[in-house]
Amino acid sequence: MAATGTAAAAATGKLLVLLLLGLTAPAAALAGYIEALAANAGTGFAVAEPQIAMFCGKLNMHVNIQTGKWEPDPTGTKSCLGTKEEVLQYCQEIYPELQITNVMEANQPVNIDSWCRRDKKQCRSHIVIPFKCLVGEFVSDVLLVPENCQFFHQERMEVCEKHQRWHTVVKEACLTEGMTLYSYGMLLPCGVDQFHGTEYVCCPQTKVVDSDSTMSKEEEEEEEEDEEEDYALDKSEFPTEADLEDFTEAAADEDEDEEEEEEEEGEEVVEDRDYYYDSFKGDDYNEENPTEPSSDGTISDKEIAHDVKAVCSQEAMTGPCRAVMPRWYFDLSKGKCVRFIYGGCGGNRNNFESEDYCMAVCKTMIPPTPLPTNDVDVYFETSADDNEHARFQKAKEQLEIRHRSRMDRVKKEWEEAELQAKNLPKAERQTLIQHFQAMVKALEKEAASEKQQLVETHLARVEAMLNDRRRIALENYLAALQSDPPRPHRILQALRRYVRAENKDRLHTIRHYQHVLAVDPEKAAQMKSQVMTHLHVIEERRNQSLSLLYKVPYVAQEIQEEIDELLQEQRADMDQFTSSISENPVDVRVSSEESEEIPPFHPFHPFPSLSENEDTQPELYHPMKKGSGMAEQDGGLIGAEEKVINSKNKMDENMVIDETLDVKEMIFNAERVGGLEEEPDSVGPLREDFSLSSSALIGLLVIAVAIATVIVISLVMLRKRQYGTISHGIVEVHPMLTPEERHLNKMQNHGYENPTYKYLEQMQI
């Protein structure tokens, strides 16, 4: 019956846990853990999880899981354990009724009142980081993710780190994201207080999480202690037993002296607050006027700032122990964290395990770097964004204002110098004039150089943004083509975005050329061929991308009209640009030559119109197979190699998309779209419409004529070669030849020909 009652109580507790889980995840996790403790203990209902706390020179403390209060060591002898294994053994001794399997350092420090020394009546309050005694199978904590905060986790099966190391890792990870650590927990235990991973919640630095009106007093204290923990130091490694004895005796002597002074004065013992970050209490923890706690028990931001200043302004202290532990301390004179050797005990709180953790705590001691107020400096120091053009205009205006200010100052100095130099000889006045002319020339040269740098930076950023947008649009377009079954509406939307991205690149190139043409015609004439080549490549790349639609003929026919409209709009812009170039009298000859390179517009008709009797449903074509196209990483459509191409390519059967102007682009092979059985009746007209422009047709004809000429010449040479072996001249006979060789030479002189060689020559023809 007792077992049945216990099982019923456990089932009832689990049901309550499930009901509370939807309301508050952390409370549910804690309730479930306490219920497990109660079931494991078998004696009463647990209200707290088992924990122990240590402070050298004082008796160890542990939590009474039935009352939730801290109690001293029952034997009255145990104090300051040396290793994590000893901590685990002590947990098992204190809680024999529980199945303690591991220990873990707590995330937050706690304030323990009335902490007494062994065989002494003197008691004080100390803030320490306790150890949790884990019961049964390890269960990770349930973390609450407030609004605007983010949840992360890290798992590294190849490493096994202690709790404090993971704490440092997650703090640095949040700082890297520009956020602060809100809460964290451990994952996958691999040893005593060692784990394979962690989970954590990061919140924005300006995020202030308001406590709920129904939050209990314990939860409020945990939040306040969490703020205090942000400035806490790493716990040191456990020292040796000899170090423990030396330091414990020193602490005992100090406490006895203090106790005698208090008894002589007859004053009551006043509890103070000592911070406990290392394994031991330092002699100088309260050297620099520790901040008194607030009357309401909370720690204000002012108190925290004062405590950080007191910590980070201390000098490095090795301590009385003789271990060799590389640590970091904040050097106030240098404004950065510097290495030093820690002895293993004592010392002060300016003691950190890593440089990043040191800087995270003491960064408020570094005076902030003044932000640049000049728009030009701001432009160069910030990366490109959607406001690139506006920031460029502001920087250019600021550059012009700065140049005018410098010129006005030099002009004013020049005028003052001329007034003072009226009575000087002519040679000296001439030298003065040359000096100021050189200054003006240098300022103009400097302004031109700064403006050139600004323009080049702007162009590079714009080109990079255009390339990124085009790449993303092309990837989406190819992904839409690869979908099974392909959706015409989605393909058309992706194609519109891709064509729009290409058009933005075209307009940017045109506007830049027109601007250079208006400012510097000579430079425009030099870059004109490059601009025309780039525009031609844009059109070829667009046509090659459109030609991929022949892999899905049903979709191509359905969106044919919309594609024609897109091409007509872009062709109108291109014709306007060509006409604007031709109107320039300086470049008429070049424009007329290069304008012929631009292929005439042909509406997009990839397939002949199908009759109503012909079935145009998707089952006529085979959809692209996943794994044969883009899905393959090595041979896929998008997984192709990157290459820098500096000249126009020829459109061959591989349909390679290229790029010029030293812009890295992806090269796509249309054969890899794959999975289709090409039909000559449908593929032929498409390639003729897309790849055979007037200039390309002339080039092909020239190549064909050249090939035919080579073939004819080769045939003529072969025909002559048949009779080329007959020689009617006199051949000198070598005196050392055998009679057979001499006879063969005579026969060849009279027209003899080996029939075997003649047969082989005829076979080659």
From Swiss-Prot:
Give the principal location in a single coarse category: membrane
Q: Which residues cross the membrane?
A: 696-718
What Gene3D superfamilies is this protein classified in?
A: 6.10.250.1670, Amyloid precursor protein, E2 domain, Amyloidogenic glycoprotein, copper-binding domain, Amyloidogenic glycoprotein, heparin-binding domain, Pancreatic trypsin inhibitor Kunitz domain, Pleckstrin-homology domain (PH domain)/Phosphotyrosine-binding domain (PTB)
**Residue ranges of the region described as Interaction with DAB2:** 751-765
Q: Which residues are glycosylated?
A: 628
The ranges of region (Disordered) come to 211-301, 597-616
Residues forming the E2 domain are 375-566
Organism domain of life = Eukaryota
Molecular function terms from GO: heparin binding; identical protein binding; serine-type endopeptidase inhibitor activity; transition metal ion binding
Q: For this entry, list what GO says about its biological process.
A: axonogenesis; central nervous system development; cholesterol metabolic process; extracellular matrix organization; forebrain development; intracellular copper ion homeostasis; locomotory behavior; mating behavior
**Membrane topology (Cytoplasmic):** 719-765
Give the UniProt entry's GO cellular component terms.
membrane; nucleus; spine apparatus
Location comes to: Membrane
State its role: May play a role in the regulation of hemostasis. The soluble form may have inhibitory properties towards coagulation factors. May interact with cellular G-protein signaling pathways. May bind to the DNA 5'-GTCACATG-3'(CDEI box). Inhibits trypsin, chymotrypsin, plasmin, factor XIA and plasma and glandular kallikrein. Modulates the Cu/Zn nitric oxide-catalyzed autodegradation of GPC1 heparan sulfate side chains in fibroblasts.
Family to which this protein belongs: Belongs to the APP family.
Q: How is the subunit organization of this protein annotated in UniProt? A: Interacts with CPEB1. Interacts (via NPXY motif) with DAB2 (via PID domain); the interaction is impaired by tyrosine phosphorylation of the NPXY motif. Interacts (via cytoplasmic domain) with APBB2/FE65L. Interacts (via intracellular domain) with APBB3/FE65L2.
Name-wise, this protein is Amyloid beta precursor like protein 2
Q: Which organism is it from?
A: Rattus norvegicus
Q: Which gene encodes it?
A: Aplp2
